[in-house]
């Protein structure tokens, strides 16, 4: 959530940022609403002070047996009670209206984020590896998996409907191996603490991660009102919800391998074949909680951690910085890592690493104390995929496919596969 004080002091910056994200200016409306709210707050405070003063005067009047004065003062107290009831209700309504608008506003892009309307304006900043060359026409992952008889969409559809997959045999083991490999690298070498998180969370937790109220239709809600997590970012970020940390404890780095659940409400007709866009998938998530001074350097570090996974797997990729029009709701800056898929002959997103500033910290009321500073500051948060396991499985299948339809197992995964070097039918 954005700081209304910052908006009052920087209305032009807010409107410029919103326009760069393809939204209408909001500063004037917000400032007017905030002025009305603060005016009501001031009126309520004055009325409360007057009511307290009059109550004392009633006692003084009774002490000298001035019943007439006491009665007049009692009438004033009753009038103040009526006024306070009305003014407090109006103040509450104005506060709720202001918070509703603020909750729907996206974060402010950093100055070095390229302006643009969509993904076509993203900027490639580096490449790793070259796309492999084949002496045959490479297949897409769903053809490879079905030819191996270890990837079944028909059975998954009978079980759960569209956008689900049943993996079996070596491909099921490969999926598990990828997740374990990624988590091991992040925990043992990249300095993250492994966390096993709940898959069901409450409203305020999803709100704290800035996925409610805006993205409710993209989530699955249970009959008791809780939400299935769309990413482990949601519970990991909220581990510090409503806490006060010491700056010496920062940065905190968490990583989790978890299932993720998404309704894909806005993806109708896109990537309907295969495993690219599923209602349920595994992902390794990285989350960092930092001070303001640490956050930008942490973004570079986190992105390098995600890139390292793909380098070890020998997968060609490129890293792009997202434009203002393509960036996520809570992000101030985002790097997408896109892996090469020979079957599609294009790069596809496999990881997204974002710095959110204090946007989530403010919603979570998560703060930290600087040394020698009595003032509390909202924490800064970052999140990144390290990486999406299903998409990484796709990339391994397509980049390591052989002419006979078999799949070479990358060297780093062979210990997780019981020494298996090749997957075949």
From Swiss-Prot:
E.C. code: 6.1.1.11
Keyword Cytoplasm: yes
GO cellular component annotations of the record: cytoplasm
Residue positions binding ATP: 262-264, 349-352
NCBIfam families xref list: serS (TIGR00414)
Record's comment describing the protein's domains: Consists of two distinct domains, a catalytic core and a N-terminal extension that is involved in tRNA binding.
Job of this protein: Catalyzes the attachment of serine to tRNA(Ser). Is also able to aminoacylate tRNA(Sec) with serine, to form the misacylated tRNA L-seryl-tRNA(Sec), which will be further converted into selenocysteinyl-tRNA(Sec).
Name of this protein: Serine--tRNA ligase
Organism of derivation: Bartonella tribocorum (strain CIP 105476 / IBS 506)
